[in-house]
């Protein structure tokens, strides 16, 4: 299997589930003309996948994209500390959505799975000291929404409604269920 992603979290989730894969990243510009946020994220994941799949028609290719959305606005990876502070301040005390889209394809076997998983996360009310402490960990700067639920960022989270691993970057349970539906046995996932 080829993972079309540099995300350390996705790699960790897939390795922990027993998948063997190689990483080949695409160099597409992560933009989409789709108006609906979930369609836009799925479109970006598909573009990442297609760039790799067209040159690897006999391989399974997996691509994904994750965003944090608050009140219709996407919070990507912060450009600097000030933007990260603003993101976290805006998330403070509120419920936001984490949207992960993934596409799994094998051209020669005519296999295609397209999926979007939406989870909700509620943050505690965060004071400036807590936000600055978290920023000092350097954890938020390579993550959508400026936090990682699997690290120090977990202390910011009051509750979640949805898939923890999707919030982390890849909905492994959903993916495994989709593989079962198309006839792949979980005991053979290291062969995919």
Curated annotation (Swiss-Prot):
Q: Does the keyword Cytoplasm feature in the UniProt annotation?
A: yes
CDD domains, per the entry: Maf (cd00555)
Domain of life from the UniProt record: Bacteria
Q: What's a single GO MF annotation on this record? A: UTP diphosphatase activity
The record's section on Gene3D superfamilies has:
3.90.950.10
- Give the catalysed reaction(s), semicolon-separated: dTTP + H2O = dTMP + diphosphate + H(+); UTP + H2O = UMP + diphosphate + H(+)
Q: Which cofactor does it need?
A: a divalent metal cation
Q: Which SUPFAM superfamilies match?
A: ITPase-like (SSF52972)
**Active site: which residues?**
65 (proton acceptor)
- EC number(s): the record gives 3.6.1.9
Location within or outside the cell: Cytoplasm
Any one Pfam family match given in the protein's UniProt record, by short name: Maf
Name a single GO biological process. nucleotide metabolic process
Using the UniProt record, name the top-level EC class of this enzyme in a single word. hydrolase
Instruction: Cite the entry's keywords alphabetically.
Output: Cytoplasm, Hydrolase, Nucleotide metabolism
Q: Where is this site: Important for substrate specificity?
A: 9, 66, 150
* Gene Ontology CC annotation, any one: cytoplasm
Q: Which family does it belong to?
A: Belongs to the Maf family. YhdE subfamily.
| Database matches in HAMAP family | Maf
What does the function comment of this entry state?
Answer: Nucleoside triphosphate pyrophosphatase that hydrolyzes dTTP and UTP. May have a dual role in cell division arrest and in preventing the incorporation of modified nucleotides into cellular nucleic acids.
Q: What is this protein called?
A: dTTP/UTP pyrophosphatase
Q: What organism, scientifically named, is this protein from?
A: Fusobacterium nucleatum subsp. nucleatum (strain ATCC 25586 / DSM 15643 / BCRC 10681 / CIP 101130 / JCM 8532 / KCTC 2640 / LMG 13131 / VPI 4355)
């Amino acid at each position: 299997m080829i993972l079309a992603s540099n995300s350390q979290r996705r790699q960790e989730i897939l390795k922990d589930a027993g998948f063997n894969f190689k990483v080949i990243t695409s160099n597409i510009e992560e933009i989409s003309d789709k108006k609906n946020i979930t369609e836009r994220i799925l479109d970006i994941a598909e573009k990442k996948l297609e760039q790799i799949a067209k040159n690897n028609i006999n391989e399974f290719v997996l691509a994904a994209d994750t965003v944090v959305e608050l009140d219709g606005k996407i919070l990507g990876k912060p450009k600097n500390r000030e933007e990260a502070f603003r993101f976290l301040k805006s998330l403070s005390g509120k419920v936001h959505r984490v949207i992960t889209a993934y596409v799994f394809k094998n051209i020669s076997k005519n296999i295609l799975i397209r999926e979007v998983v939406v989870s909700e996360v509620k943050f505690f009310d965060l004071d400036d000291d807590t936000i600055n402490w978290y920023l000092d960990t350097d954890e938020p700067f390579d993550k959508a929404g400026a936090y990682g639920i699997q690290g120090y960022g977990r202390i910011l989270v009051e509750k979640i409604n949805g898939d923890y691993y999707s919030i982390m970057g890849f909905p492994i349970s959903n993916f495994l269920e989709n593989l079962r539906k198309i006839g792949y046995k979980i005991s053979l996932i290291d062969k995919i």
